[in-house]
């Protein structure tokens, strides 16, 4: 039918990482805890394996009465954005070999000294630092993909006005998530209405303050509906008024620094299982 058109497409991406990350053998002897509570091991030189990100999609356009007055259009498919490789670079730069630090709770251990070399090590052995942050990535991590569907109708009205109603829904296929693999199980809960979890300690491995780990989730979503009236003119100008409302929820708003993303994520319970919350991209009206 001339007034009904379908389109289909298939895209695929294969992110690949060279074997450039440094190995810290000491980390391989440590046990960590993933977001499901299971004990796991990591290697600092193990980056995500290459995997195919399939992105099929279909679309349609239907001129209902074949007179360009009433048009239904829409489509559905999986979409892959441009990979943000900085997420992976966190692991390359935070492995306990390149840099290290000392976190002291007792300020009398190293009192203030204006000399910047006062506490600088006299020798650097090349072995892991006495204390170091880790940024890790789950071996089966996949870059973000969303399944997005939209439907819309355009209707020509008297006086040359075009009315449009549209709805878009997106859900995570491979959404981003972070958890601290060095955070132990909560030991108790508060009493009363505020029954949040409590921790008696914040490290499984004492020399690793945090091991923020990049992983995936598939619970985030967003939707938006809009309605507009538009009056185009022959000289190329147009007048348009529109209203839209939407909602966006995810488990974390990813940033370029793994630790900062995990620490700055507002939660009310277990920080390794934050649950859905409004995204910073939540547009509302």
Each predicted region: which residue ranges?
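Residues on the lipid-exposed face of transmembrane beta-strands in outer-membrane beta-barrel proteins
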Residues: 1-2, 10, 58-62, 151-155, ...
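Exposed boundary/loop context
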Residues: 2, 70, 119, 268-270, ...
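Outer-envelope beta-barrel architecture signal
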Residues: 2-6, 68-72, 159-161, 233-237
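Active/binding-pocket-proximal capping segment
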Residues: 10-14, 24-29, 245, 258
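Solvent-exposed loop/turn segments at secondary-structure junctions
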Residues: 14-15, 79
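Gram-negative outer-membrane beta-barrel transporters
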Residues: 15, 164-285
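Short Gly/Thr/Asp-enriched flexible loops that form oxyanion-binding sites at enzyme active sites
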Residues: 18
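Solvent-exposed loop/turn elements at secondary-structure boundaries
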Residues: 21-213
């Amino acid at each position: 039918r001339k007034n009904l058109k379908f389109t289909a497409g298939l895209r695929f991406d294969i992110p690949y990482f060279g074997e450039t990350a440094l190995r810290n053998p000491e980390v391989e002897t440590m046990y960590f805890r993933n977001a499901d509570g299971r004990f796991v091991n990591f290697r600092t030189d193990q980056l995500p394996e290459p995997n195919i990100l399939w992105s099929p999609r279909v679309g349609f356009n239907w001129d209902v009465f074949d007179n360009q007055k009433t048009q239904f259009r829409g489509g559905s498919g999986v979409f892959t954005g441009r990979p943000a490789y900085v997420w992976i670079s966190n692991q390359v730069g935070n492995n306990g070999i390149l840099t290290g630090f000392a976190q002291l709770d007792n300020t009398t251990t190293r009192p203030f000294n204006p000399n910047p070399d006062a506490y600088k090590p006299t020798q650097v052995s090349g072995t892991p630092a006495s204390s170091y942050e880790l940024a890790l990535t789950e071996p089966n991590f996949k870059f973000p993909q969303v399944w997005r569907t939209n439907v819309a109708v355009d209707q020509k009205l008297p006086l040359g006005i075009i009315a449009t109603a549209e709805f878009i829904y997106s859900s995570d296929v491979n959404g981003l998530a972070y958890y601290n693999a060095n955070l132990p199980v909560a030991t108790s809960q508060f009493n009363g209405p505020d029954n949040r979890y409590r921790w008696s300690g914040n490290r499984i491995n004492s020399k690793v303050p945090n091991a923020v780990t990049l992983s995936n989730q598939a619970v985030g979503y967003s939707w938006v509906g809009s309605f507009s009236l538009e009056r185009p003119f022959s000289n190329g100008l147009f007048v348009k008024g529109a209203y839209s409302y939407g909602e966006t929820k995810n488990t974390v708003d990813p940033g370029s620094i793994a630790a900062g993303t995990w620490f700055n994520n507002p939660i009310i319970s277990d920080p390794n299982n934050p649950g859905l919350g409004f995204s910073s991209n939540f547009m509302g009206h």
